[in-house]
Structure formats: structure tokens, C-alpha cells
Amino acid sequence: MYAVIKHGGKQYKVSVGDVLELDRIEGAEPKSSIELNEVLLVKGDDTKIGAPTVEGAKVVAEVINNARGKKVIIFKKRRRKDSRKKRGFRRDFTRVVIKEIVA
């Protein structure tokens, strides 16, 4: 059984036991449980497709930790103009493990 969920403007295909890195969820403590209610599709014995979401479906996940991703360097240069910009970016994310899919 798997489900397609929407979180943070992205879609994820998840099954029970999958580990995901979602955009930072404020107030999510490690070992706490969260519910993801924007379920777009559930596939098991039968398929349920939402319009836009499946009514009554949810995905239960357990928070593993909150962390920051690797640094990404953004470097812009205009040739012959002595113009340079260097910026760094680190993504904040919440790592979760999928515990249950309720259809």
C-alpha cells in the first residue's frame, strides 16, 4: 500500500516505513507523532483518487529529528565588470518515518 501526499508545495510517494525529509515543521519534537492530511492518492487493494484530496485519508508519521541540509554555494559573476556575489544557503528540514496510512 502506498499514498501520494502533498507537503510544502511538493508531492511525495510514501509507504509504511519510508524515511522522508520534509520542509521544517514548526513545533515538531523528536519522537512525536504528526498527521499529514493532504493525501492526493491511496493505492492498496483498490485505488482512491482525490479531487483534490481523498476525504478521510491521512498519513501518520513519527518525527526523527530536525536538522539542516548541506550548504549550497550560490556564486554569481559578471565577466570583466569586477562584480561578484557569493551567498550560502542551508535548508531546514524535519526527518520523519511513515508509521501508518489510513484510507
Swiss-Prot record:
GO terms for biological process: translation. One of its GO terms (molecular function) is structural constituent of ribosome. It holds the Pfam family Ribosomal_L21p. InterPro entries: bL21-like, bL21-like_sf, Ribosomal_bL21, Ribosomal_bL21_CS. Keywords: Ribonucleoprotein, Ribosomal protein, RNA-binding, rRNA-binding. GO terms for cellular component: cytoplasm; ribonucleoprotein complex; ribosome. HAMAP family: Ribosomal_bL21. Belongs to the bacterial ribosomal protein bL21 family. NCBIfam families: L21. Part of the 50S ribosomal subunit. Contacts protein L20. This protein binds to 23S rRNA in the presence of protein L20. This is Large ribosomal subunit protein bL21. It comes from Nautilia profundicola (strain ATCC BAA-1463 / DSM 18972 / AmH).
